[in-house]
């Protein structure tokens, strides 16, 4: 008799994806972040669902409804802070996951990589719209500043912005539609994640060496299920430490002031996970140029397979490329710091230099280093 998990139409899919899946025997903890992202997404959908039961997407009551959730709803405070800090954990896992892909050359799986970049954009859009919902000062002004960037698009810009706003400013219509989009997008993300996984399982996972591991596979269960459970426990530990000991550590105090269109906060800045892109946006004194740089800072990931000039896939045995990779990481951390600073000397010039360095590293230095390494190995 055949095993039900191998014969049942639904269980067969689960079996082939999570149980009998042939996995490389040498994948490190950097390969844990895929499953952690799945856990983050499920957690965000569940906490978000319970928040949506008590939230009202009306400009007059949105702020009060969030206060009501924290004060009056049973365990509302923990649900709210798990959702807010869950987003931070989500982005930490996302950036680690992308970094792993860059380091070990996983971008050579073209379909998987491109779906991944689309996923990154979708998650960023969802997080941005979610930040607008509490209708605090930073919610309102963040929404105003970021949506207003679209007015830099020639000819159709102004019409486009007013169409997104649903009026002549960020108002009730904007908040309502942002809530609608914020609710629906995570389900689209879940569908995209399944497609991401579908394409990945066509080729099988990459591994730290970047060499084919077809001759040395092990079943996903129990080896990697237990490893993923450990990762999940550490993720939940980190999240709950944030939620229970420092729930507002990563937030902005301005968002505890209700939105006021007549009073602009002294410093408008997004959540920490967008600061690097915000720094790139601000480093260019031209509006359209800034918007293009902002979009390209993420869209450049699409070009990674084209910029791969090395004869080796992974950076594991490429010291020069490794060095440049970690310089890129340091550069992104610098941009993140600059994005949170006021627009004044010396932060302006540091931001401009870091922005130039970001694109120069990816477009010029890393491909050149790869070619130098090829020559050194006489390949």
Swiss-Prot record:
CDD domains the UniProt entry points to: cytochrome_b_C, Cytochrome_b_N
Residues passing through the membrane, by range: 33-53, 77-98, 113-133, 178-198, 226-246, 288-308, 320-340, 347-367
SUPFAM superfamilies in the cross-refs: a domain/subunit of cytochrome bc1 complex (Ubiquinol-cytochrome c reductase), Transmembrane di-heme cytochromes
Key words of the record: Electron transport, Heme, Iron, Membrane, Metal-binding, Mitochondrion, Mitochondrion inner membrane, Respiratory chain, Transmembrane, Transmembrane helix, Transport, Ubiquinone
Membrane topology, from the record: Multi-pass membrane protein
Compartments where found: Mitochondrion inner membrane
InterPro entries named among the record's database cross-references: Cyt_b/b6_C, Cyt_b/b6_C_sf, Cyt_b/b6_N, Cytb/b6-like_sf, Cytochrome_b, Cytochrome_b_C_euk/bac, Cytochrome_b_N_euk/bac, Di-haem_cyt_TM
Coiled coil: none
Protein residues bound to a ubiquinone: 201
Cofactor(s) for this UniProt protein: heme b
Note on how the cofactor is bound: Binds 2 heme b groups non-covalently.
Pfam families, per the entry: Cytochrom_B_C, Cytochrome_B
Biological function: Component of the ubiquinol-cytochrome c reductase complex (complex III or cytochrome b-c1 complex) that is part of the mitochondrial respiratory chain. The b-c1 complex mediates electron transfer from ubiquinol to cytochrome c. Contributes to the generation of a proton gradient across the mitochondrial membrane that is then used for ATP synthesis.
PANTHER family xrefs: CYTOCHROME B
Family affiliation: Belongs to the cytochrome b family.
Miscellaneous comment: Heme 1 (or BL or b562) is low-potential and absorbs at about 562 nm, and heme 2 (or BH or b566) is high-potential and absorbs at about 566 nm.
Record protein name field: Cytochrome b
Organism placement in taxonomy: Eukaryota, Metazoa, Chordata, Craniata, Vertebrata
